[in-house]
Amino acid sequence: MDKSKRHLAWWVVGLLAVAAIVAWWLLRPAGVPEGFAVSNGRIEATEVDIASKIAGRIDTILVKEGKFVREGEVLAKMDTRVLQEQRLEAIAQIKEAQSAVAAAQALLEQRQSETRAAQSLVNQRQAELDSVAKRHTRSRSLAQRGAISAQQLDDDRAAAESARAALESAKAQVSASKAAIEAARTNIIQAQTRVEAAQATERRIAADIDDSELKAPRDGRVQYRVAEPGEVLAAGGRVLNMVDLSDVYMTFFLPTEQAGTLKLGGEARLILDAAPDLRIPATISFVASVAQFTPKTVETSDERLKLMFRVKARIPPELLQQHLEYVKTGLPGVAWVRVNEELPWPDDLVVRLPQ
């Protein structure tokens, strides 16, 4: 290579070096103001699985992925034909048990009527016994004086004994009637228990039918469908996955020196890569109590400062409700926090929201 070509090559290398320095200078990250900290993060939200409470076949799914849903909105339905038949069977069992209760109550009334009749007979037999007993007493007195024959005395004695036997028989009938009453009451209790059991079964099946309509537990957005209509799921099988749009936050990491100064409820600003012109307000909702990752050895104070703590900055729910169409999980960005809360936010970090 001749001398002129070598000079040209050096000029090219020099120009490239100058260009690299200028590019680095122009594209270098802006310095972090004193009293502030910044860290990379990603938008996240609480995920909620929509699952079937009982085993069964998916009948229909009413929402598509990405759809915004409100709390209580029906998202999917399970096939309830078997449950409907089981409910009809339970209703029939209720009616049958109620009929048994009515029959047992009628039998109780009959036994009570029989007891009253038996008690009346006891009273009658008691009166008859009292009458013949008095006659027998008089007959003995008259027989001792020879006023009546021995045959008459024997007849009066036999009549008294017969009346006493009749009274005992009537009393036994009363006791039997009372036992029948207790048995009838037991039958009523058993029949009522069957009614309650059948009603409990019907309520449980009705609850299962109601739970077969899978509803949104809160406001949110459907992320993806885990299953499709026609699939058979076990109890607890997932059908949909959704995100709770009332709990959206950015997770990021800060070193010990900065994380230790943060307090829950402190202000933060979020800047998303997809919307670099916006400045989203947030509040510190979580600071880890232990470091999330550390160097292999921690011996010096400088190394201790390298310990990184996980932090969450939560976007206010009322702000989310105003801009639901912009909420997307997984978006990367940066989070700014104030290490010194007495400092005002710089002009570049003043809240700017979509119009």
UniProtKB/Swiss-Prot annotation:
It comes from the Bacteria. GO terms for cellular component: plasma membrane. Residues 1-19 form the signal peptide. One of its GO terms (biological process) is transmembrane transport. Keywords: Signal. InterPro entries: CusB-like_dom_1. The keyword Signal applies. Residues 128-155 are annotated as: Disordered. The keyword NAD does not apply. This is Uncharacterized protein YhiI. It comes from Escherichia coli (strain K12). The lineage of its organism: Bacteria, Pseudomonadati, Pseudomonadota, Gammaproteobacteria, Enterobacterales. The gene is yhiI.
